[in-house]
Design a protein with these regions (language model features):
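Short, well-ordered, mixed-charge alpha-helical segments that flank or form enzyme active sites
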Residues: 10-14, 33-36
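A general structural signal for short secondary-structure junctions and capping/turn motifs
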Residues: 16-18, 39
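Repeat-based blade/solenoid architectures
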Residues: 4-13, 68-69
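Acidic, small-residue rich beta-repeat scaffolds with periodic aromatic anchors
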Residues: 28-172
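Acidic/hydrophobic-patterned starts of short beta strands in beta-sheet-rich repeat architectures
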Residues: 18-30
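Hydrophobic/aromatic beta-strand elements that line small-molecule binding cavities or substrate pockets
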Residues: 11-15, 46-49
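Feature marking well-ordered beta-strand scaffolds used for ligand recognition
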Residues: 1-3, 58
């Protein structure tokens, strides 16, 4: 038995992405759920793993997975074509820009996100003014931080990089 953190929804689904005869394990990056919007309003980027030497290893960024990542991004962009309001929803934009950065298309994507993200949506990154961990912080000590700064830090902390220069500048 292999221990893994719990996954939301239906867990893994399986595809042989690289054509080697072994099924890859696909899931979404649960860290995006509720981070910038409601669960339903969140676009969680695809994660791809393989069973190697008795453990599950993240292979999302391996070159053999690139076509599948492009396919996933195309699906999200098609959804936004059908529902143009998504281009003004923080949860969608956060996942979309993460996908674009992962594919090396972050500069133009960051500019689009910077022009479309909204402050004060009730979701998004916060700091605790009393210095406690967020989960232990009294509600009156929670203060929102600017959404773009929070998004840039979130992406960097969770391995979505390298960030575009404009986003990287916000993490200092």
């Amino acid at each position: 038995m292999i221990d893994q953190p719990p996954l939301d929804g239906d867990g893994y689904w399986f595809e042989d992405i690289d054509g080697d005869g072994a099924q890859e394990l696909l899931s979404v990056d649960n860290r995006f759920l509720y981070a910038f919007d409601s669960y339903a309003g969140s676009l969680a980027p695809l994660r791809i793993a393989k069973l190697r030497n008795g453990s599950i290893e993240d292979v999302t960024d391996e070159s053999a997975m690139r076509k599948r990542l492009i396919q996933d991004l195309a699906g999200a962009e098609y959804e936004a074509k059908v529902r143009p309001d998504l281009w003004h929803e923080n949860g969608f934009l956060a996942g979309w820009v993460a996908n674009k950065i992962r594919l090396g298309e972050g500069d133009a994507a960051w500019a689009k996100v910077a022009g479309n993200m909204k402050e004060d949506t009730g979701f998004g990154p916060q700091v605790c003014t009393s210095g406690q961990k967020i989960e232990d912080c009294p509600a009156d000590n929670l203060k929102p931080i600017p959404v773009l700064k929070g998004l840039a830090s979130f992406l960097k902390e969770n391995g979505y990089g390298p960030l575009p220069a404009a986003a990287e500048a916000l993490t200092h």
